[in-house]
């Protein structure tokens, strides 16, 4: 089952989805995973497929759009790396307070730029028990120069 939700990060309303395993029993608490999209991604692009796979493995899953992306509110012209970390932490908080989630068993997953975000988050937030990074970038400045003209900096 999928349920659309919203939560706040730094006072900005973010859009997300919760995915519930089909075999979840009333009163049961499962490990939870927050899935994070990359630089130009949105939660509805490829994360629903990943959420379904994790649901089949028994996890509660949450996807969301960062501030200024997809259905979330916020400035559309700004990329603020640390602000994305704060968004992931807010998503973890929201997921962790769901009655179906064991807040002692939270994981984060990110692809591309989302990989860099979850690695940083895991290094600075003790709630993270598991981190998966896929297709991460290695050098942020070099990468940014490859996708933006100098006059766009």
List each model region and its residues.
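N-terminal cap/leader regions of alpha/beta-hydrolase-fold enzymes
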Residues: 6-12, 24-25, 52, 56, ...
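Catalytic nucleophile-loop/oxyanion-hole region of alpha/beta-hydrolase
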Residues: 42-46, 62, 69-104
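Glycine-rich, phosphate-binding/catalytic loops in enzymes
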Residues: 34, 50-53, 78-80, 125, ...
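N-terminal cap/lid segment of alpha/beta-hydrolase-fold proteins
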Residues: 1-31
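Primarily recognizes the serine-hydrolase "nucleophile elbow" in alpha/beta-hydrolase
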Residues: 90-153
């Amino acid at each position: 089952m999928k349920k659309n939700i919203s939560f706040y990060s730094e006072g900005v309303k973010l859009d997300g989805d919760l995915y519930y395993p089909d075999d979840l029993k009333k009163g049961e608490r499962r490990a939870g995973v927050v899935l994070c999209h990359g630089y130009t991604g949105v939660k509805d692009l490829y994360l629903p497929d990943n959420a379904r796979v994790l649901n089949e493995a028994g996890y509660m899953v949450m996807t969301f759009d960062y501030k200024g992306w997809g259905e979330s509110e916020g400035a559309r012209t700004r990329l603020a790396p640390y602000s994305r970390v704060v968004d992931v932490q807010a998503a973890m908080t929201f997921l962790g307070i769901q009655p179906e989630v064991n807040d002692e068993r939270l994981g984060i997953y990110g692809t591309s730029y989302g990989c860099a975000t979850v690695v940083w988050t895991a290094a600075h937030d003790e709630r993270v028990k598991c981190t998966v990074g896929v297709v991460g970038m290695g050098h942020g400045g070099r990468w940014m120069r490859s996708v933006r003209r100098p006059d766009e900096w």
